[in-house]
Structures are given as C-alpha cells and as structure tokens.
C-alpha cells in the first residue's frame, strides 16, 4: 500500500465520513468487513489515530437507544466490536492469541 505513511494517509481519508453507505469508498462500520480497519493504524505505527477513530465511531454511531447500532448485529458482531473497543482491545488477527491495544473507555 506504499509504506506506513501512505497507509496512514489513506486511512485518514477513509475515515473522513462514517457510515456513508455500503457502496461508498468511505468507512461503513455497519458491516463486519470494516470492523478491524481502525486497528490497521496500530500496524502502521499510528496507535493514537486508532484510538481517535475508535472513540469517534463509538460516540457517533452507537447509542443505548433502540436502533443504536450502525448496522446489522449479525450474531452479535457489532455488539462485540463495541465491548472489545470499550475495553481498549481488539482481536485483530483471527486465530492468533493476543489483541491490538487501543484506549479503554473506562478507568
């Protein structure tokens, strides 16, 4: 993808708009394939950006009201994304023990 700086720049553009639709080239966090993308910043050496975009997704797209999920909660996928991200963790690599680390919502 052109190196860490290029990856970070492309991710910044990708997260300019949240949930603009499944056919948009911007982030659509209401679908499972997008759930791990905020943690790609960690692997590009920009963990503060992971923390910033995850908190933005939590604040803007999730709520405790009916319809408070940004998409279809297929088998609890979006709910578990929220719980993991609120803990400041994400199982970024399936089948590998360990987590990508973010910023916990709680003290």
Which stretches of residues belong to each language-model region?
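Non-catalytic C-terminal accessory modules of carbohydrate-active enzymes
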Residues: 3-5, 9-20, 25-107
